[in-house]
Regions:
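Bacterial N-terminal signal peptides that target proteins for export
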Residues: 1-10
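Substrate/cofactor-recognition hotspot
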Residues: 125
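Conserved lysine of the Walker
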Residues: 128
């Protein structure tokens, strides 16, 4: 398992160190290089890491309407708004408690058909993005916290952010106090 993760990390590093030009991102086959950890969560909901050069343009071609930035950096607003996206800035630190207000704004935005399709990202598309997608899975898709956390971990959430794991389980308790979703869905 660890060897597979290391091999995957080396492969991803090699791809990114090779460099990708904006013209390459016009080719849909180059999506993994332009949009790290790009993945469809549900119809109208996508996740990934910080788009590389040309990545936002590729998202536009795919019909994405809203960009949700979970990074502390706020440097992409002008660029994504110029491309016609709706921009939602929800900065968070994976080491801190994520506020209920931030979580609710996220869930409201992702669930609003007028804002879909949405693309959610942080720097790596793993820790903060994995956390928020896990909450979406629990709240909107009825997933168990175990399944939501396992998916986040499998996509790259790092184990040392124990507060994120704890919050996923606490959120599930509040979202489904009767135990719905805990059956492993």
């Amino acid at each position: 398992m660890l060897r597979a993760r290391i091999a995957r990390w080396l492969l991803v590093s090699a791809v990114f160190s090779a460099g990708v030009s904006r013209a390459d991102c016009a080719d849909v086959q180059k999506a993994p290089e332009c949009l790290p950890r790009f993945y469809q969560v549900a119809p109208g909901v996508y996740r990934g890491g910080q788009p590389k050069d040309g990545g936002f343009e590729l998202l536009k071609q795919r019909g994405v309407r809203t960009i949700i930035n979970l990074r502390d950096e706020h440097d992409e607003r002008e660029r994504v708004e110029a491309l016609g996206f709706h921009y939602v800035y929800l900065p968070m630190d994976a080491r801190d408690e994520i506020s209920a207000g931030t979580i609710q704004t996220f869930l409201d935005t992702v669930s609003d058909p007028a804002r879909q399709p949405v693309f959610i990202h942080c720097q790596r598309g793993a820790d903060r993005t994995g956390f928020m997608v896990g909450l979406y899975r629990i709240a909107k898709q009825g997933w168990s916290p175990e399944k939501a956390y396992d998916e986040a971990r499998d996509i790259g959430m790092r184990w040392w952010y124990r507060g994120l794991k704890r919050q996923i389980f606490e959120f599930a308790e509040k979202a489904h106090p009767e135990g719905r979703g805990a059956a492993g869905k």
